[in-house]
Structures are given as structure tokens and as C-alpha cells.
Amino acid sequence: MKKIICSLLFIPILAACKKEETAPTEKTYSVKYEVVGTPQQNSNISGSISYISKNSPTATGSWSISGWSVTESNWALKPGDKVGFTATLSNLASYQAAIIVDGVMCEFDLAATTLPLNYPITLSYTIE
């Protein structure tokens, strides 16, 4: 009987000591996506870019002569949130692609070849 009473008294003590899990807290970030490239000789780079923005998971962008860049400022993100883009471009001789979060380069990719680079460039980063 004594053991049962002691056990019953011990349960509320354990419950009071239980650490509650807290949800990850949001923080405001500046996220910059960037792709610059060089076209194959006697050709132009063409294609499309889709990216995760603070307002849409499927925003789109266009390639210009100098490349593509977009910055999302004041973006409330929490650990585990994913940012990134896919650039589907053709006639590239070389490219450099990056994701920059709060001024720090988090992801980077580059390639150069004599053959056209006609495959998607995909970069993503998970907020820590």
C-alpha cells in the first residue's frame, strides 16, 4: 500500500519536471539567389528560373544578358525551412550559381565545358 501511495505521489512530480518542447522561432533573413553565365560561342543563353520566394513556393524569373539575381528581404524563416531555385537554361558554356543568406554564401555551384550545359541548375539550402 505504501509503495502505491509513493508511486502516485511521484507521478505529478515527474509531470511537473517534464521539459516542454518549444517550436522553432522565426528570424528575419535576407536571401539572395544568383546565377551568372557565359554563353556558348555564337549563341544566346535562354531558359527559365523557378524559385521559392517569401510570397510563393513557385515564383518565376527570367534570364537577362548579365544573368539572374533576386533578393528576398525581411523573410521570416525558422530552422528547417528550405529555400532554393532551379534554373533551366540552355547554351551555357559556364556558370556560377549561389544562395546567399544574410550576406553569407551558403550554397555555391559552378561548371565550365566546351559542350553546351543544357541541364537544370538546382540549389537549395535549409535554414539552420
Where are these regions (language model features)?
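Bacterial Sec-dependent N-terminal signal peptides
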Residues: C6-S7, I11-V35
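First exposed extracellular module after export/assembly in secreted or surface-exposed proteins
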Residues: P24-E128
